[in-house]
Amino acid sequence: MKQVRFLPQPARRARAAAARRPGAAALAAAALALAGCAQIPREPITQQPMSAMPPMPPAMQAPGSIYNPGYAGRPLFEDQRPRNVGDILTIVIAENINATKSSGANTNRQGNTSFDVPTAGFLGGLFNKANLSAQGANKFAATGGASAANTFNGTITVTVTNVLPNGNLVVSGEKQMLINQGNEFVRFSGIVNPNTISGQNSVYSTQVADARIEYSAKGYINEAETMGWLQRFFLNIAPW
């Protein structure tokens, strides 16, 4: 005999809710995964690391003479220009770049062909008069242009992270500013010739080799300028 058992209404609701939980959990996990793809992390273009600590000086000794090998300061008759790992240097950013490019192309070709077939005798009734002619023309014209202007002025203090065998200094540093819930930062890295450093312990960015300057931000404004993950998805698969 087949038995049918009816569950109370609260029990049926609880069982239905339990059956829906795995699907809801999977949907929530998928939503979180897609939300994580909404913001693509931007890798810095500057050379890492951004700072370096000077090496530890040797242990202090007291031999009783004027010369002390454990002295970590600068010599008396030495200038204050950076020359060791951990020294700091001020970079005066003065970048002004203008670029203009224009191009054009023009092509024109024409052709004309005519072929007459005279007929005589018994061929006259078959072909009568046959005139063959063909004409063709091909014309192409295109123009293009592009222009760009970039200006960046400011100052940033960097740290010597390495000293090359020829004496050039590898510098790198960053400056962060938190303004109205937006974190803005400036990063700089490059190779400096010590001979170009001024008496104020500064050098222009135009005199730095392999200079890499980055100005970016993190916050609501930066997120508003970023395309959403769903829009990027349809942009990649759209055929037009």
Curated annotation (Swiss-Prot):
GO terms for cellular component: bacterial-type flagellum basal body, distal rod, L ring; cell outer membrane. InterPro entries: Flag_Lring (IPR000527). Assembles around the rod to form the L-ring and probably protects the motor/basal body from shearing forces during rotation. The basal body constitutes a major portion of the flagellar organelle and consists of four rings (L,P,S, and M) mounted on a central rod. PANTHER family: FLAGELLAR L-RING PROTEIN. NCBIfam families: PRK12697.1. The lineage of its organism: Bacteria, Pseudomonadati, Pseudomonadota, Betaproteobacteria, Burkholderiales. Transmembrane segments: none annotated. Keywords: Bacterial flagellum, Cell outer membrane, Membrane, Signal. It comes from Burkholderia pseudomallei (strain K96243). Pfam families: FlgH (PF02107). GO terms for molecular function: cytoskeletal motor activity. The keyword Transferase does not apply. Its main location: membrane. This is Flagellar L-ring protein. Belongs to the FlgH family. GO terms for biological process: bacterial-type flagellum-dependent cell motility. It is found in: Cell outer membrane; Bacterial flagellum basal body. Residues 1-35 form the signal peptide. The keyword Transit peptide does not apply. Disulfide bonds: none annotated.
